[in-house]
Amino acid sequence: MTGSHDSDLAREKLIVALDYWNIEDARKLVRDLGDGVSFYKVGLGLQLVGGNEFARELIAEGKRVFLDYKYYDIEETVQRAVAQAAELKIAFLTVHGVTSIMKAAVAGRGNSDMKILGVTVLTSMDAEDIKEMGFECSVEDLVVARARRALEVGVDGVVASALEAAELRKHTNNKLMIVSPGIRPSGGARHDQKRVATPFEAMRAGADYLVLGRPIYAADNPKAAAQAIIREMADALRPD
């Protein structure tokens, strides 16, 4: 049986991806989920239709916001863009896991509490994809290498598949936060994800936060779907 403390902790660790292309659809999901979800991801789909203003709206309502824009540009541009995000009181922000980009992001963050996350390898990619990009190593080795660089430059965490979470814990001495997308409930469709794990598996592997979109917003009852995922996460948090 899941305790209330485990459920509360699990709720804080669930990030619902607002993968929409207009604000009204995203706003409706937030209303439908109510107090059951406290953390949301705003990505590229909403960026050009008022994503930053919507992030302000969510924060004013007491929600935490993960701004998933995956910044990748010249260092000065990244630094200034990150500084602007910090002024919004964003909780998490992603940048590409390139050393110079991560350094610029850390500088732009300044003294704010915003957490900078380096993107390692997208969960929609597999060994064949990274081979096409010119890498001869395994996905796991590339993820670990980028995480080590993230740790060296002062980034707070990484975005990585739960499949690599255990190795990341081992190679970074538990000093990096791990945020894992590519999460699918048992038996759920993978869609465009190639490296996936269930909520239970991901939490047990060492992920700190889980990002789920379609399993919630495409469900017949999004609120019930979110609650079921939170229960599964809470079960994983309980000691054996």
Swiss-Prot record:
Question: What are the GO cellular component annotations?
Answer: cytosol
Query: Which SUPFAM superfamilies does this chain map to?
Result: Ribulose-phoshate binding barrel (SSF51366)
The Gene Ontology terms for molecular function here are:
orotidine-5'-phosphate decarboxylase activity
Q: Which Pfam families match?
A: OMPdecase (PF00215)
Q: Does the keyword Lyase apply?
A: yes
Query: Which GO terms fall under biological process for this protein?
Result: 'de novo' pyrimidine nucleobase biosynthetic process; 'de novo' UMP biosynthetic process
Give residues annotated as binding substrate. Answer: 19, 41, 68-77, 123, 184, 193, 213-214
Q: In which pathway does it act?
A: Pyrimidine metabolism; UMP biosynthesis via de novo pathway; UMP from orotate: step 2/2
Signal peptide: which range, if any? none
* Enzyme Commission number(s) from the entry: 4.1.1.23
Q: Which reaction does it catalyse?
A: orotidine 5'-phosphate + H(+) = UMP + CO2
Keyword annotations from UniProtKB, A to Z: Decarboxylase, Lyase, Pyrimidine biosynthesis
Question: Lyase as a keyword?
Answer: yes
Specify the domain of life of the species encoding this protein: Bacteria
- Please name the catalytic residues of this protein: K70 (proton donor)
Under InterPro entries, the record lists: Aldolase_TIM, OMPdecase, OMPdecase_bac, OMPdeCOase_dom, RibuloseP-bd_barrel
Protein family according to the UniProt entry:
Belongs to the OMP decarboxylase family. Type 1 subfamily.
Q: What is said about its interaction partners and assembly?
A: Homodimer.
Task performed by this protein: Catalyzes the decarboxylation of orotidine 5'-monophosphate (OMP) to uridine 5'-monophosphate (UMP).
HAMAP family found in the cross-reference section: OMPdecase_type1_B
Q: What is this protein identified as? A: Orotidine 5'-phosphate decarboxylase
Q: Please give the organism.
A: Nitrobacter winogradskyi (strain ATCC 25391 / DSM 10237 / CIP 104748 / NCIMB 11846 / Nb-255)
